[in-house]
């Protein structure tokens, strides 16, 4: 029988070195590669049998076998697939198909940069065995050959290839494991079972470890939806994504067309425990041909849906050299966009049909949606704006922006007020007057709410307006405005003196009839609101953080204004201004600078 000793071509040597030292940073995925090759070999045999019915003979129960021999430190993977002839082994294993071509050399150079699909294009996953083995023995037989073939190499530049007597069709690969504790675990039963479950659990063919089948041949996402109950989804979710709770929602997608894929997505009930830590990573599990490729594929899901768990299985996706990072290709982008639309659509359905369930979702994950609206200066506004909900003064319940607009009648602006709580907002002086007018206000209790609305600018052509802004008006009563302006002109000295006392604490002092029944109110002028200032100051202790341009508004109809007028030339004037200013600070949730001074002034004025 034929026997030869050969030398790897230069490119193959280089690839071997690249595979061992550069491409696979995760040692354990060698088993995934070899099982995937075995799966492909059976696929090829089944395809061939469609036109050559005699090829299977009496060996038509397809299977993959794994065994270990601790004494000899070997791990063996075998299949009863198509096998290879002597020439095929020499071409596909010894020299690698196309290895002498200009294309391969170019791709090899690109592989060093980590961005090319060598495995997918040239089938070199076999060489990943050298990550854990210092010698590999391959025995194979094609149904079209009388003899089998043995191939042996230590990965040192040479290989032996010879014909052998072999009866059974298929391929057996024996890895002679390297010495060292880090390789010993690959001889343990539990480790092999764990790796198969992790990477190859849904291979189409049964994987045997001894007499035990250790994989599930048909994944849940490829089963008929009619076969599945909520319990099936719930148990799969909890076992796969390590959650104690059932998911809030599952989405099972089977897409056919130019790009075919299956997707199974889950919205959890609770935020992941590490959600706000640097360890948290978004992404979906990725399978290709039922082979696990990646734990967290970020490209499949946008940042604002980062809380979603799940997986995608697509046979046609192009993979990079290590099968760990996907190339940025058109297929992936299409799948990602489709998933984004489907998730949005499902959330909108819940919002419409089960408000209580949506509110439960919103309290956990609403911040991610709001952050998505803010991202890129509101670029995602159109996609996400109809998922937003806020508590409304209309009925103290959550409302959508569309529902608000449908109720606003002839009003031109969507009113909102930032507040520590719904109760705190309800008792603000301005809110009482707006309630009397029958005008609805969105109550923003999350510190990022106002940033979200500012990023949006408007909804359905209606601009957002804070009732704490200096240009907010209860009405367009020109006569009333002129009356207030006249009072201000008459008390110009009072206003200037108050501003002089407060110095740079406020940018100006004004009289206003738009602050309800309160004696005074702190308003914001310009783009930065009072609530934004508080939020930014809590994020950092930096004194250089931007401040809101504050306006102290005084109610000319309040009794304290009359007292202020009568004391303009007395020592009580500054005390009254101090009380009005600090009172306004407290109403807006700010800390007053000197509580003792405030109490002292307040007590001295109570006569």
Curated annotation (Swiss-Prot):
Transmembrane segments: none annotated. Keywords: ATP-binding, Chaperone, Cytoplasm, Nucleotide-binding, Stress response. Residues 535-607 are annotated as: C. Residues 324-534 are annotated as: B. It is found in: Cytoplasm. GO terms for biological process: DNA damage response; protein folding; response to heat. It holds the Pfam family HSP90. GO terms for cellular component: cytosol. Residues 1-323 are annotated as: A. Disulfide bonds: none annotated. GO terms for molecular function: ATP binding; ATP hydrolysis activity; ATP-dependent protein folding chaperone; unfolded protein binding. HAMAP family: HSP90. Belongs to the heat shock protein 90 family. PANTHER family: HEAT SHOCK PROTEIN 90 FAMILY MEMBER. Homodimer. Molecular chaperone. Has ATPase activity. This is Chaperone protein HtpG. The lineage of its organism: Bacteria, Fusobacteriati, Fusobacteriota, Fusobacteriia, Fusobacteriales.
